[in-house]
Amino acid sequence: MPAENVSPEYVAARRVLLDALEALGPHLDAIVLVGAQAVYVHAPLGDPRPTYTTDADLALDPELLATHPDIARSLADAGFAPNATGNPGSWVSVNGVVVDLMVPLGAMPPSSRRTAPLEGHGALTARRTRGLELALFDNAPVALTALESHDTRTVTVRVAGPAALVIAKAIKIQERVEGAREDRVTSKDAGDLLRLLRNVFAESIGVSLRDLEASHPVVQPVVSAAVDWLDGQLTGRSPLIDLAVADRSGIEAPAQVTAAVRQLTRRMLDAYRDADG
């Protein structure tokens, strides 16, 4: 990714991501990178606006996670501290970059608690998060490097695939739009979703969704929910289109953004529903 098209915040977020992954080295097999940094692995081609994110999101697979060493202790030793907000799974670096540790909601027994109890690890180590279920199956190892020339580190970690990221972004946007916390709705998530659909063949994402759902029935509820919500966003004015237009404001005409969201999402959904492949 060209250095001139990367924001300073993203450079710092990648540096802190590598710090966290190094601290959690013994647990790397149970970690999957999700969120914007995963999106940019698959969709490095952007626009005149610098690639931007301020944090790092990691999904934990409880089936693969070892009980030792303690994640909280490892992060603390590396200079991270629990977020003062008290949000479970939110860890803050010395320079204020947040690393979120999340366990897919469907990978744990049902509970009303946000905390994700993990044997051998503190109660606030991670939190349950809906929408990440597919990332435990749709991922591949990627060698991540720093975005600064003087930092020569490389850490190989599993990165969620485009299908998993589309579902995660859709569920995140839906929950924030329909929830009581409208202040947490950001246009960037819709922009990231559109970026994925533009950089990765939309039909191939749809086929991957269908195949993953068939191979791993446990993800069917969340995939179905995301697909149904996306389908309902493609006619008339909708929160998804409004957010995507807002994200591209000043860069791209609203009509062009609207057409791109509708056409690319429809192509993905049609491929997903094409039983004959």
Residue ranges and their predicted role:
Residues 1-277:
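Compositionally biased terminal segments of proteins
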